[in-house]
């Protein structure tokens, strides 16, 4: 189906209409001229996914009413009188349950009140309180200096040895240390100290609850976790606690299921779109719709951003296919033609491409133009030039990597990363999300062009996404014949072993996070939710690539989480 069959956007840009006859290039179907991608077929049943559009988990009206009532109760809890440490712990639980977005203003108001409180006796000698206060304030945009931890060091400048026995304090210090900036050496020391000591005691912690929290944190710190994924885990964990607040737990479950129901409807519509494009029948490229929807929920899960998710998932699904064309399937001549067409944003010359590649190209054009039309209709802003520019820049980066491969050129790590932080493709998703969410008073041609120029916040996001991708996919992609990745570039450049190269890249990840953390506090033309989109795309990558390539290959851990986050609602007690 042509997205522009009846669209008025043709006045803005030449409409892309379905082409009845695409002249195939000689040898189009000749497998000996193509490298094999060896991708496994999708394990998801697309008929089932499509059915979610109409038969998804419908939340009962009584549960909606109950959720509204409980929401007011939780709001009263947050604003109620209690000891400062208890207030911090409540806010921490609310956030981990995935409810921060429901109480954003109340949480910030309470935290600011605690920040302005001149009394420090309640936290200054309490490692848990100091670290929890530090993390929650920084997470919510209130700067706290690192030297609040100086009081926990001895005369020699090291963390006091007796802190090794304070497991809860160590855990809070560990989580706080991940919000550090470049140059904050004390937080680097805190990260090393807490990590070492938590690893030493993790198997001997007497409290089962605390032990599980420690192991979970060592596997993935909170600051690197996607909120929606973390909420699903923590709801189950919170239910096991001795001092669980039953109404808070009930509200978390209800809200999770309500949002899940909305996501299911979106996923069903996207699955239908995907099947209608016909691209699901192309065997030489990845079919990644489900993974991309999970990624979309990591980027932004809140119900009001359905259009952002829809555009992000469609673009990401097409990006995966275009990436495969450049990396594996297309000849250099075809890639030159493809890039030129995208750069001109004009399909003249498409008849020089094979039918399979033309289908992908036309779907890309139609989808981008439809997103542009929706922006014009809903926001009165022509976003097509900016979306087209992002696609063109991405394809040029892909082409450079293809030329490296075909010529046998081996880039330095720095050269590779400069290209790779854009070729990882998230600039396109971020540009589109910016166009969809920036306030109309601030949305201008110049501001959108600035996002496309890859400013520092977007740059750190791209760099981290690239590094995580390479750590998880490097070996498999080299086996498929892809261009060298950062690990191989470093090995070639320095003579390091693969193990040493991986450690170096992991070090770059930590440093890039520090840069990202600082960007969150610097003066910037960006505001929420766009700032959050940049951080959250990285958290999605961290999840998919932490144990290998959970994106290209649907591994057990990604499928299990997808089922629990998107398909299966959280069971409620019978009285609920």
From Swiss-Prot:
InterPro entries named among the record's database cross-references: Isoprenoid_synthase_dom_sf (IPR008949), Terpene_cyclase-like_1_C (IPR034741), Terpene_cyclase_plant_C1 (IPR044814), Terpene_synth_N (IPR001906), Terpene_synth_N_sf (IPR036965), Terpene_synthase-like (IPR050148), Terpene_synthase_metal-bd (IPR005630), Terpenoid_cyclase/PrenylTrfase (IPR008930)
Residue positions of motif DDXXD motif: 323-327
UniProt-annotated binding residues for Mg(2+) 3: 469, 473, 477
Gene Ontology MF annotations: magnesium ion binding; terpene synthase activity
Residues binding (2E,6E)-farnesyl diphosphate, per UniProt: 286, 323, 327, 466, 469
Annotated Mg(2+) 1 binding sites: 323, 327
Alphabetical keyword list: Lyase, Magnesium, Manganese, Metal-binding
Cofactor binding note of this UniProt entry: Binds 3 Mg(2+) or Mn(2+) ions per subunit.
Names of the cofactor(s): Mg(2+); Mn(2+)
EC number: 4.2.3.-
Annotated positions binding Mg(2+) 2: 323, 327
Pfam families listed in its UniProt record: Terpene_synth, Terpene_synth_C
Domain of life from the UniProt record: Eukaryota
BP terms from Gene Ontology: diterpenoid biosynthetic process
Record's comment describing the protein's domains: The Asp-Asp-Xaa-Xaa-Asp/Glu (DDXXD/E) motif is important for the catalytic activity, presumably through binding to Mg(2+).
Classification via PANTHER family: (-)-ALPHA-TERPINEOL SYNTHASE-LIKE (PTHR31225:SF245), OS04G0344100 PROTEIN-RELATED (PTHR31225)
Function: Produces almost exclusively beta-bisabolene and only traces of alpha-bisabolol from (2E,6E)-farnesyl diphosphate in fragrance biosynthesis.
UniProt record similarity statement: Belongs to the terpene synthase family. Tpsb subfamily.
Protein's name according to its UniProt entry: Beta-bisabolene synthase
């Amino acid at each position: 189906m042509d997205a522009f069959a009846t669209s008025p956007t043709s006045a803005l840009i030449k409409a892309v209409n379905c082409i009845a006859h695409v002249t195939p290039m000689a040898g189009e179907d000749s497998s000996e001229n193509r490298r094999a991608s060896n991708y496994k077929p999708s394990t998801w049943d697309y008929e089932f996914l499509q059915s979610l559009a109409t038969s998804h988990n419908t939340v009962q009206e009584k549960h909606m009413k109950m959720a509204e009532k409980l929401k007011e109760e939780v709001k009263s809890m947050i604003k109620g009188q209690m000891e400062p440490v208890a207030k911090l712990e409540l806010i921490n639980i609310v956030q981990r349950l995935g409810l921060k977005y429901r109480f954003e203003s109340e949480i910030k108001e309470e935290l600011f009140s605690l920040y302005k409180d001149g009394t420090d006796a309640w936290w200054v000698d309490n490692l848990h309180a100091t670290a929890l206060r530090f993390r929650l304030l920084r997470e919510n945009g209130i700067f706290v200096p690192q030297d609040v931890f100086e009081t926990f060091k001895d005369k020699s400048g090291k963390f006091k040895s007796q802190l090794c026995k304070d497991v809860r304090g160590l855990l809070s210090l560990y989580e706080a240390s991940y919000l550090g900036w470049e140059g904050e050496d004390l937080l680097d020391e805190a990260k090393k100290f807490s990590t070492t000591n938590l690893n030493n005691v993790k198997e001997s912690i007497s409290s089962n609850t605390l032990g599980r929290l420690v192991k979970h944190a060592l596997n993935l710190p909170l600051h690197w976790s996607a909120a929606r994924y973390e909420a699903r885990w923590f709801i189950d964990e919170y239910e096991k606690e001795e001092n669980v607040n039953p109404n808070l737990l009930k509200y978390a479950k209800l809200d999770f299921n309500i949002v899940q129901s909305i996501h299911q409807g979106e996923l069903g519509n996207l699955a239908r779109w995907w099947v209608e494009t016909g691209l699901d029948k192309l065997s030489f490229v990845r079919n990644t719709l489900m993974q991309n929807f999970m990624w979309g929920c990591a980027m932004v899960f809140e119900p009001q951003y359905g259009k952002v998710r829809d555009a992000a998932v469609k673009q990401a699904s097409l990006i995966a296919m275009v990436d495969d064309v450049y990396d594996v399937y297309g000849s250099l001549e075809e890639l030159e033609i493809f890039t030129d067409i995208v750069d001109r944003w004009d399909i003249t010359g498409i008849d020089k491409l094979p039918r399979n590649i033309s289908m992908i190209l036309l779907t890309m054009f139609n989808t981008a133009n439809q997103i542009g039309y929706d922006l014009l209709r809903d926001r009165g802003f022509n976003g097509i030039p900016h979306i087209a520019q992002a696609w063109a820049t991405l394809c040029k980066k892909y082409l450079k990597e293809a030329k490296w491969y075909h010529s046998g050129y081996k880039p330095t790590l720095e050269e590779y990363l400069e290209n790779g932080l854009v070729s990882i493709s998230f600039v396109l998703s971020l540009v589109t999300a910016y166009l969809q969410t920036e306030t109309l008073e601030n949305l201008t041609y110049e501001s959108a062009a600035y996002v496309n120029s890859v400013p520092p916040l977007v740059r750190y996001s791209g760099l981290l996404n690239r590094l995580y991708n390479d750590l998880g996919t490097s070996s498999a992609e080299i086996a498929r014949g892809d261009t060298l990745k950062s690990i191989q570039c470093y090995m070639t450049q320095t003579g390091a072993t693969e193990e040493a190269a991986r450690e170096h890249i992991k070090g770059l990840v930590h440093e890039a996070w520090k840069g990202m953390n600082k960007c969150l506090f610097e003066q910037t033309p960006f505001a929420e939710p766009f700032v959050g989109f940049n951080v959250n795309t990285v958290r999605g990558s961290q999840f998919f690539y932490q144990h290998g390539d959970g994106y290209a290959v649907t591994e057990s851990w990604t499928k299990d989480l997808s089922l629990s986050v998107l398909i299966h609602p959280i069971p409620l007690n019978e009285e609920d």
